[in-house]
Regions:
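Conserved beta-strand-loop-beta-strand element in the redox core of flavoprotein oxidoreductases
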Residues: 132-134
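Oxyanion-binding/catalytic loops of NTP- or PPi-dependent enzymes
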Residues: 2-114, 122-125, 137-141, 145, ...
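Short, basic/glycine-rich phosphate-binding loops at helix/coil junctions
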Residues: 127-129
Length: 471
């Protein structure tokens, strides 16, 4: 009997060993649950790869790991992501962005009126909920959920193209401050895009998972999330694999767009000093914005960057002599000058000009100049950091780990400001643009039971928690 049991045990062991060895050579199963970071300025999608334990962030058709959270409506079609961004200056009244600021949120009339003044598109109050007015062949209203659904549908299709199979399940992240209504509205947007949301995870928790802190021996974790339009600071307490958001603070009007605007205003002054005139064509203003963004990114790794952009200026207003060969009549221009005067259009053309001058505007921007232009904005980052420490009854020396999230935390001076405040370097081991989507994808893998199994992050609800905003 004992001999039979030994033989049986050996056979079972052999089968298990054979299965394990065979598993090494079999193709890994395709992940079926995606992780989504639906950000205010950019959004992205990723998957947890069974077997390797790695996360794959899925790129769009042009190789971008994230897409702008922008939807533009025209008479011909609806353009999402980078296609929508291309229309932001030529079709501003029908190009919707920052929809995440409005989703599921109830506004007073005064609050919504104040928010609306910041945007070129029209926002209407529907019993406290925001709706966007769009005019193409006809005028109609779209909800923030509808805008979110368009973005999520784009991400869903990107994942399907990459994985070669239909996708219907996802895990999604939301700001820790989102209440039940905002979370349900985000889920509704996903449902409209054909996605069943299996779990909603807070963005700071997702970021902590991306940094592997759900498996690390740390207790107090500070997450600084600085993106294109918002700053969020969260203090997390970690106990085992459980996360409790202990305090939140931030600035909903501070981000990379504000840093860009400071540089744009500087260039506005430079152009006026050099030529006495400013560009008025929407297409060229859009190119100038793109050049500013490129310079900002360049300055994260270089001490200086050259901005070079071709502009068309009204000849009548020029104060600088230019060769006659550069003067072009307005009949050769494909687009009429904009008549609108504001910082977005950088121009004031009271009448259609007869002649225009094509100039190549070129200037070198140093990192030192960029830091000087934004010095006060960079220092504002410390205000919510100090607030969460105060609310969490913590000394800054008691923070075990500082993690950075969001593309704007790439800026060297921002990292220095945070490092000088805490007296130690923040953790920058994860791409800040992809930290949240990486964490959400890990959580999607856990929900799907993917091997190798990770330690799941369990969030402890803190219903009494409120975010302190410094706008």
């Amino acid at each position: 009997m004992a001999g039979q049991m030994a033989v049986l045990g050996s056979a079972i062991l052999a089968l298990l060993l054979a299965g394990y060895l065979a598993q090494q050579y079999l193709p890994m199963p395709t992940p079926k649950i995606i992780g989504i970071d639906l950000g205010t300025t950019y959004c992205s999608v990723g998957v947890f790869l069974p077997g390797t334990g790695q996360v794959k962030v899925i790129a769009d058709e042009n190789g971008h790991n994230s897409i702008p959270s922008i939807v533009s409506f025209t008479e011909r079609d609806v353009y999402v992501g980078y296609d929508g961004l291309e229309l932001a200056d030529s079709n501003p009244q029908n190009t919707i962005y920052d929809a995440k600021r409005f989703i599921g949120k109830i506004f007073s009339s005064e609050e919504l009126k104040s928010e609306s003044s910041r945007y070129p598109f029209k926002i209407f109050n529907n019993n406290g909920s925001a709706e966007f007015s769009v005019t193409t062949n006809e005028t109609f209203h779209v909800t923030p959920e509808h805008i979110g659904a368009q973005l999520l549908l784009k991400l869903k299709r990107m994942a399907e193209d990459s994985l070669g199979m239909p996708i219907s399940k996802a895990v999604i992240s939301v700001p820790a401050e989102f209440d039940e209504r905002q979370r349900n509205s985000t889920i509704k947007a996903a449902n409209l895009a054909g996605l069943n949301i299996l779990r909603v995870i807070n963005e700071p928790t997702a970021a902590a998972m991306a940094y592997g802190l759900h498996k690390a021996d740390v207790f107090n974790v500070l997450v600084v999330d600085l993106g294109g339009g918002t700053l969020d600071v969260s203090l997390l307490n970690k106990q085992g694999g459980m996360f409790l958001t202990r305090a939140m603070a931030g600035n909903n009007k501070l981000g990379g767009q504000d840093f860009n605007q400071r540089l744009m205003l500087y260039l506005y002054d430079q152009l006026h000093q050099m030529y006495g005139s400013l560009p008025t064509r929407k297409e060229e203003i859009h190119h100038l914005r793109q050049a500013v963004e490129a310079v900002k990114l360049n300055l994260t790794v270089h001490e200086a960057a050259t901005l070079r952009v071709s502009l068309t200026l009204p000849e009548r207003k020029l104060t600088k002599e230019v060769p006659e060969s550069e003067v072009k009549t307005n009949t050769v221009l494909k687009e009429k000058p904009s008549q609108k005067t504001d910082l977005k259009n950088f121009g004031d053309t009271p009448k259609v000009e007869k002649n225009f001058v094509k100039v190549l505007f070129e200037t070198e921007i140093s990192r030192k100049l960029f830091e000087m232009l934004n010095k006060d904005l960079f220092e504002k980052i410390l205000v919510p950091i100090e607030q969460v420490l105060k609310e969490g009854h913590l000394n800054k020396a008691e923070v075990d780990e500082i993690v950075l999230v969001g593309g704007s935390t790439r800026i060297p001076q921002i990292r220095r400001v945070i490092q000088d405040f805490f007296g130690k370097e923040p953790n920058t081991s994860v791409d800040p643009d992809l930290a949240v989507v990486t964490g959400v994808a890990i959580q999607a893998g856990i929900v799907g039971g993917s091997w190798p199994l990770q330690v799941s992050a369990i969030e402890i609800p803190n219903k009494h928690l409120q975010k302190t905003n410094f706008n």
